[in-house]
Each structure stands twice: as C-alpha cells, then as structure tokens.
Amino acid sequence: MKNEVYMSGTGNDFICSSYERDLSQIEITSIVGDSLLPIDGVIFIEQINSSTVKMHYFNNDGTPAELCVNGVRCTAKFAVDNNLVDNSKLIVRAPVGDIEAVVENDTVKIEAPMPTLSLIHI
C-alpha cells in the first residue's frame, strides 16, 4: 500500500492509503488483522482529477460499504495532505454520490446526503 496512514474521524478509526488496484475481501481482512490498532475500516483514495477523489471504503470484515460520513472526512483530509487535489475544496466520490468537502487545517466540513426514509431502500 502506498502512503498508508492511520486516521481517526470523530470516533471511527481507519487505515487510509492511495488506491493502487482492487483488493479481494481476504486481502482487506488481512490488512485489518495486521493493524497494530483496532480499526473500523480501510479506505483507498483514488485521484479522479485535480478536484475529485474516489473513496473505496471497506468495513473491517472486508465488505464494501456505500458510505461512512467519518470516512468521507478522512478521505478529504488524506487527499489534501497527499496533494491528490489542487486545493482544500474538493469532491469525494462515494457509491451514494458526490459529496462536497472543505478542509481547513485540522477541520473537515462536508455536505452529507439526506437519510433515506423509504422502506424500499432499506
């Protein structure tokens, strides 16, 4: 993994790394098992363009997840810190859609999608 870091986002802990390739569920659980600290998930950040990154988020059991709001915040901070985007205002692409984020020093603000209240989507 490239640029691997441990990040904490308001109660959730992650290993974040630059995206290199798709990994299997077994490979993800191996990363979790090898972690020296307990983690909630693994996030791979893929550069899309100078203002957009894609978040590949996996729970600690290796299953993919559509969204983790704290994971989005860590993704945005990682992207800025590793110069994957040109400035501190960016788009984080997640399976649920694009999420706007602004990184200001150690604070990350996001526009989270509204919760789904329909039983069809549950």
Language-model features: locations:
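A glycine-rich beta-to-alpha transition motif near the start of alpha/beta enzyme domains, typified by
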Residues: M1-N105
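Ligand-binding beta-strand-loop-alpha-helix segment within the catalytic cores
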Residues: P113-T116
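Conserved small/polar residues in nucleotide/adenosyl-binding loops
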Residues: I120-I122
